[in-house]
Structures are given as structure tokens and as C-alpha cells.
């Protein structure tokens, strides 16, 4: 699998760096991820007008990632079923 992306709020990422893991958001069954060609659509649908966002590039090797269909029919997306180890994030960029 190619690298996958996750859009994170800066404050959430800073907390993850301090603890060593980025947790599954409260109440969610997984961490939502996307492939590079899906990023623009994710930003438009879920983060329009948001600021202080970061693009996390994740090395998927060894992670419990499952590609699943989006509930809204927007396509198949990688979902991380479990917390994200900070060490698996290979690049962080502001959006």
C-alpha cells in the first residue's frame, strides 16, 4: 500500500507527539485516512473553512489499516483500526 494521509488539527498532533500515539477520536471506530488523490475531496467535504490543519503522511507497514467503502458512497478509504504510533508518521505538513 502506498503512503496514506490523515488530516489532523495541530493541537491534536502536538498532544500525540507528547504521548507517542495519536488516538482514535472519541466515539469513532477508527482513524479516517485517505490516499493522496483523495485529499482535496476530504478537505472540501469535512474541513472547509478550518484552519490550523496538518497533513500527516503515514507509513502503513505494520498498521491495522483496512480499505473500506465510505458510508456516503464517496469511494474506498483506508481506515486505521487502532491508535497511530507517532513513529509511523513520516512527514507532517501544514495545510
Over which residues does each language-model region extend?
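Conserved, structured core segments of small domains
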Residues: 1-95
